[in-house]
Amino acid sequence: MTVKKNIVIAGGGTGGHIYPGIAIARALQKLDPSIEVHFVGTARGLESKIVPREGFPLHLIESGQLNVKSPIQKMKTLLKIPVGLWQSIRLLGQLKPLYVIGVGGYASGPFVLAASIIGFNTAVWEPNAMPGMANRILSRFVDKCFVVFNEAKKHLKGDSIIQTGMPVRAEIEAAVHDSSENQKFHLLAFGGSQGSRIINNCLSDAVLGGGDWVKDLSVVHQLGSADFQAVSEKYKNAPCEVQPFEFIYDMAKYYQWADIIVCRGGASSIAEAAAFGIIPIIVPLPAADNHQQKNAESLVEKNAGRMILQKDLTPERLISEVQSLRADKALREQMVRNIKNFYIPQSATVIAKEILQ
């Protein structure tokens, strides 16, 4: 009887956790085609849409977010934890994985903790300069920690903490060297996999306000499902070329196209910008631990990006940042060189080799 070589990747919620997990899964299977990768997530996360579409089996458990201000929400999560742990233990017994990798998100904590307690090989991948609470706790129990930012190491415990960079989707990594010169100035905007209302409203207001800044400007804007209809209707009156999308599946195409991006401060967005050498204007998502702000600050300190705090985001401020970059080609060229230093090639393969060694 052939023993299945299962590896489990736990986590999700947003594209910033799911797509790096998929990149790791593909790298594992490339190194050893006999490996079967299973994903564990929750019903509320985007993994329920993305993972099956990518061809991997997905198992769902109960979990939630502890790092919230609402006492009611925190209580709901606390009640889900024992259920999620029991589901995790049962699933681990069924799959008997060679390794369990947590990539962050609701399901990562309980599943990796259960796997560590039982005695399975475990690892966590931390995308942010300031690790989240779950990974700070899990780092004490797991065999290996993989980090994107070197600054994260001082916040984690454990004997094996390795800086590997951000696992970038294979189709994006393959397209890195295909960027081309643009006649117009190309601005790509997105607020993460689910969109950002404040970025959507600010950028659309800035564009519709017209003025010198829209001359020879071309915009591609991923809006997310909640705002797509309303904002794309607004853009019909835009004084420049605008392509609104609900969701962009072929991000590599538009990274090749873009001169600058306006985005949140998730590590995935930063890594993909670094891979293509695109200057980001980052609007960090406010959160309890401000991990996106700390990610953005890492870039700003190295003159590799710009940051606008959400409380300071206005059409005027956004236009000012875009125009200051657009007007100074030498500055842009230097910032492109700087952000490329944040890119570690073949990160997913590095992680896969560490798992399989």
Curated annotation (Swiss-Prot):
For whether the record's keyword set contains Signal, the answer is no
Fetch the Gene3D superfamilies from UniProt: Glycogen Phosphorylase B (3.40.50.2000)
Q: How does it sit in the membrane?
A: Peripheral membrane protein
InterPro entries the UniProt entry points to: GlcNAc_MurG, Glyco_trans_28_C, GlycoTrans_28_N
Q: Which domain of life is it from?
A: Bacteria
| MF (Gene Ontology) | UDP-N-acetyl-D-glucosamine:N-acetylmuramoyl-L-alanyl-D-glutamyl-meso-2,6-diaminopimelyl-D-alanyl-D-alanine-diphosphoundecaprenol 4-beta-N-acetylglucosaminlytransferase activity; undecaprenyldiphospho-muramoylpentapeptide beta-N-acetylglucosaminyltransferase activity
Pathway named in the protein's UniProt entry: Cell wall biogenesis; peptidoglycan biosynthesis
Q: Where in the cell is it found?
A: Cell inner membrane
Q: EC number(s) for this protein?
A: 2.4.1.227
- Might you report a single GO cellular component term? plasma membrane
Which terms does the UniProt entry file under GO BP?
Answer: carbohydrate metabolic process; cell division; cell wall organization; lipid glycosylation; peptidoglycan biosynthetic process; regulation of cell shape
Kindly name one Pfam family recorded for this protein. Answer: Glyco_tran_28_C
Keywords (alphabetical) are: Cell cycle, Cell division, Cell inner membrane, Cell membrane, Cell shape, Cell wall biogenesis/degradation, Glycosyltransferase, Membrane, Peptidoglycan synthesis, Transferase
Q: Give a yes or no for keyword Cell cycle in this entry.
A: yes
Specify which residues bind UDP-N-acetyl-alpha-D-glucosamine according to the UniProt entry for this protein.
T14, G15, G16, N128, R169, S193, I248, Q292
Q: What is the reaction catalyzed?
A: di-trans,octa-cis-undecaprenyl diphospho-N-acetyl-alpha-D-muramoyl-L-alanyl-D-glutamyl-meso-2,6-diaminopimeloyl-D-alanyl-D-alanine + UDP-N-acetyl-alpha-D-glucosamine = di-trans,octa-cis-undecaprenyl diphospho-[N-acetyl-alpha-D-glucosaminyl-(1->4)]-N-acetyl-alpha-D-muramoyl-L-alanyl-D-glutamyl-meso-2,6-diaminopimeloyl-D-alanyl-D-alanine + UDP + H(+)
What is stated as this protein's family in its record?
A: Belongs to the glycosyltransferase 28 family. MurG subfamily.
State its role: Cell wall formation. Catalyzes the transfer of a GlcNAc subunit on undecaprenyl-pyrophosphoryl-MurNAc-pentapeptide (lipid intermediate I) to form undecaprenyl-pyrophosphoryl-MurNAc-(pentapeptide)GlcNAc (lipid intermediate II).
Q: What protein am I looking at?
A: UDP-N-acetylglucosamine--N-acetylmuramyl-(pentapeptide) pyrophosphoryl-undecaprenol N-acetylglucosamine transferase
What gene codes for this chain? murG
